[in-house]
Curated annotation (Swiss-Prot):
A cellular component annotation (GO) from this entry: extracellular region
Keywords: Amidation, Neuropeptide, Secreted
One BP term from GO: neuropeptide signaling pathway
Protein name as it appears in the record: Lymna-DF-amide 5
Localization, UniProt: Secreted
Domain of life: Eukaryota
Residues that bear Phenylalanine amide: 13
Major subcellular site: secreted
């Protein structure tokens, strides 16, 4: 589940 959250955060930047 962390992978999805991490991906979203990185996508924002």
């Amino acid at each position: 589940p962390f992978d999805r959250i991490s991906s979203s955060a990185f996508s924002d930047f």
